[in-house]
Each structure stands twice: as structure tokens, then as C-alpha cells.
Amino acid sequence: MSPGQKEALPVADRTPPLGVEELHALVAAGDIDTVVLAFPDMQGRLQGKRFAARFFLDEVLEHGTEGCNYLLAVDADMNTVDGYAMSSWDRGYGDFAMRADPATLRRLPWNEGTAMAVADLAWEDGSPVLAAPRQILRRQLERLAGHGYTAQVGTELEFIVFRDTYEHAWDANYRGLTPANQYNVDYSVLGTGRVEPLLRRIRNEMAGAGLTVESAKGECNPGQHEIAFRYDEALVTCDQHAVYKTGAKEIAAQEGMSLTFMAKYNELEGNSCHIHLSLADADGRNAMAEGGGMSDVMRHFLAGQLVALREFSLLYAPHINSYKRFQPGSFAPTAVAWGHDNRTCALRVVGHGRSLRFENRLPGGDVNPYLAVAGLVAAGLHGIEQRLELPEPCPGNAYTADFAHVPTTLREAAELWENSTLAKAAFGDEVVAHYRNMARVELDAFDAAVTDWELRRSFERM
């Protein structure tokens, strides 16, 4: 390194996994015959179409395709529901345009002869669909860029593997399934070896899809595992997260197995999705590090996280099941607190120098990464713009200390979100109303459901 040369912040290769010209060549050679074009919906699931590869190149890549706008206005079961301003029976359930982002082209090794691109959504006049998760994140990243920073993000998804097919799991009402491990295999090389054929295939095929694989390890709940990927720019990471989550399920199904990312499958440890974030400045340096510690930028950014955390919890924990993770002593947070390498806090500061970053420990495996990262960026920008002071860290057990509490139910989180002036200022009234309605729809469905717990409690004895 020559004198005066900047030390670059290490990031993953940003070269698109598959270029347009390379795709043309693969299609001409007959190696690719199908292209998936998909966008993340409100739950972070990929929705879209499969195209003949030649038609995709000749028509769709330049002009886009259409999709019914109800795809951002349905419940998790794809039922039409009331309350969304952008899409309804009264508005005729028209279309929006799905426009491929060429930078997201990649092969899908688990689907023979298949490539994929992620789409952005636009209305007929070309204006973006504001409630689309990818657009929500783009808007916050543009705001961050206005301050001279880019967000570097990594997500850590946990999942539980079962030796049952998805079809059997459905028929069994998702009860009585056989986990791939019989006991806690956290960090166990022996225990994870039993699931290694599946985990190895997932790792290798994700690498073939352009993701940079780091490692895999066992977790605490029987059958629970985690595969880690290298961090990257925020939008790239969120796209990769969505591809990985879908692809892992497809690969498991092909192997006659199933896996779940739901936040709390049973009364044991839940599936987390800790999100790590750092900021890079225009020179590629870690803007959060200064003089062997945290910079003022990081302190303000982290202070913003604390101020907004309760009001933005809907973005980090979007479902009823999400809130069942938040139990004392569970490694899932209950306290709105931060600490140095302290896993009892909602916000954990880790790393040193150029690797210095913070981790938000609220999200579970059911998180929509686009919305969660948008929330992290918006909260941090509030801290920077208001120059918020960071309180002292929690030095011990945040579970038993006197801190504000993470919301304990989706209902509480939805009310905080709906009444948040900070959320409305950062995201706009349309987005706040849209995702408040998403929570209302889920709450109404749950309130009307008769649960197994009620049957066991009341069938004979009441």
C-alpha cells in the first residue's frame, strides 16, 4: 500500500453473478432455457413468473412484464382483503409493471437450465410503487447516500431441518415431524455431520447463484442450523437473502426433506435472523470506526436505533409468531438496550477497526429483510440528523436490568408503528398505512382462528 493510499473496507465482489451478454451466450448455446423474474412481496417472499429465456431477452428485459397489483394487497394465504389504498375490488385489481434489475441476474443451479432476475415495481406512468419492499429500501438508501454513506449489511438466517417432505408436513398439520437432529448440536461437528449432505448442497448451489458462502454451524433447537454468507451492500444482501431463503426450501424439497424459517416453531429456541450493519464513506472506509473505537457517526446512528426500535418493531418482527421469540434467557432480546458484545441486548456492538459494526438481534427468520434494513437505515439517519446522544451501554444482563421493553405482541407493535411520527416522516403516510393494514389483516385472522391450545383446554373440561 503506497503512502497516503486509503485502506479499503473489505466487501464482497459486486460484479453481477451473470451479465446480460453472458446470458445471451448461454441461451444461444442451449444452457439456459428459463428465466425467473420475481419481486419480494410484503412478507419478503419472491413472487413472479417463469419465462422462456429467449422471450425474456427479446421482450421482458427491456420492456418488463405485468403482475396483478393484488400481490401487494393480500394476506399470507393469498386471499384478497380490504383496507389497502393501492389495490382493491373498487379499484379493479389492475396491474403494475415488473421491471428486471439487470444487476441481479444469476443462475439458479437447483433449477436446471434456469436463470433469475429480481424486479422493481412501477405503475403505468413509470412512477415507483411506494409500498413495494424493494422500493422502500431504495428510498432509505438514497437518503443515506445523500449523507455520503453506503450501508454494508449481513443477515444470519437460522432454520430447522426436518426429515419429512413438505407434503407430509402439510398433511400432518405441521405436528409430529422428525427433526434432522435429536438434540442440541450448537457448534457440534459430529451433530452437523448428519445433515451435511443437505447443508453442503445448499452452500455449493448458493455459491453457484453468486452468493459468497462463509460457513455453516449447528444451533440449539433439534435440527436447527445456520449458513452464513459474506456481507455486501444493503440491496445486494437483501436480494441474496430472498434468493437463498427460497432456494434452500426448494433444495430441501428436492432432497425429500423440509425446513422452516418461522420465528418460533415450538417452545424451544426460535429461528433468529440477526442483521449486521456498518457504514462505508465515499473512500470505502468504515465510517463507524475512529481512533480505536466508535466514531461520532456510529454513536449517533446507534442512538437512533434505540429511539426508533419500539416504533419500528413491526419492520423487524412482522408476524404474530415473531413475538414468541422474545423470552428472557432465550438469546432473543427483550430489552431496548445496547452493549459491547452483549447478546442479552437488542443491539450488540461487535468487531474492531474496519470490522466494527452493530447487530440488531430482534429479527427472526420470518423477517422481510428489505423492510428491516430500511428500518435500520431510517432509524440511524434520524440519529445522525438529530445528533442524538448515545446512552451508556448495558454492562451485564439486560434481561433483568431496567430498560424499556421490546413490544411483546404484534398488536402492540402495530399500534406503535401506526402512531409513530418518526415512521411517517421517514417512510411517508402511504407506507405506514399499508403495513399497518398488513398487521391488522393478520391480527383479524388470528383472532378468528380456533387454536390447538383452545381445543386441548376446552374440548372436555369446559
Curated annotation (Swiss-Prot):
Residues 30-126 form the GS beta-grasp domain. InterPro entries: Gln_synt_N (IPR008147), Gln_synt_N_sf (IPR036651), Gln_synth/guanido_kin_cat_dom (IPR014746), Gln_synth_cat_dom (IPR008146). Mg(2+) 2 binds at E158, E219, E226. Disruption phenotype: Strongly delayed growth on defined Evans agar supplemented with 25 mM ethanolamine as the sole nitrogen source. Growth defects showing no mycelial growth, only swollen and sporadic germinating spores in cells grown in defined liquid Evans medium supplemented with ethanolamine as the sole nitrogen source, but normal growth when supplemented with ammonium. Inhibited growth in complex medium supplemented with 25 mM ethanolamine as unable to utilize ethanolamine from the medium. Its EC number is 6.3.1.-. It catalyses: ethanolamine + L-glutamate + ATP = gamma-L-glutamylethanolamide + ADP + phosphate + H(+). The keyword ATP-binding applies. It is an enzyme of class 6 (ligase). Residues 133-462 form the GS catalytic domain. ATP binds at E214, H276, L277, S278, R343, R348. SMART domains: Gln-synt_C. Keywords: ATP-binding, Ligase, Magnesium, Metal-binding, Nucleotide-binding. Mg(2+) 1 binds at E156, H274, E359. Very slightly decreased activity with glutamine synthetase (GS) inhibitor methionine sulfoximine (MSO). One of its GO terms (biological process) is response to nitrate starvation. Pathway: Amine and polyamine degradation; ethanolamine degradation. Induction: Expression is induced by ethanolamine and by N and C starvation conditions. Low expression in low ammonium with high glucose concentrations, and in high polyamine concentrations with sufficient glucose level. Transcriptionally repressed by EpuRI. L-glutamate binds at G270, R325, R343, R361. One of its GO terms (molecular function) is glutamine synthetase activity. Involved in the catabolism of monoamine ethanolamine. Catalyzes the ATP-dependent gamma-glutamylation of ethanolamine. No activity with polyamines. No complementation of the L-glutamine auxotrophy of an E.coli glnA mutant. Enables survival of S.coelicolor under high local environmental ethanolamine conditions. May play a role during starvation conditions to limit intracellular ethanolamine concentration, which in excess is toxic to the cells. Belongs to the glutamine synthetase family. PANTHER family: GAMMA-GLUTAMYLPUTRESCINE SYNTHETASE, TYPE-1 GLUTAMINE SYNTHETASE 2. This is Gamma-glutamylethanolamide synthetase GlnA4. It comes from Streptomyces coelicolor (strain ATCC BAA-471 / A3(2) / M145).
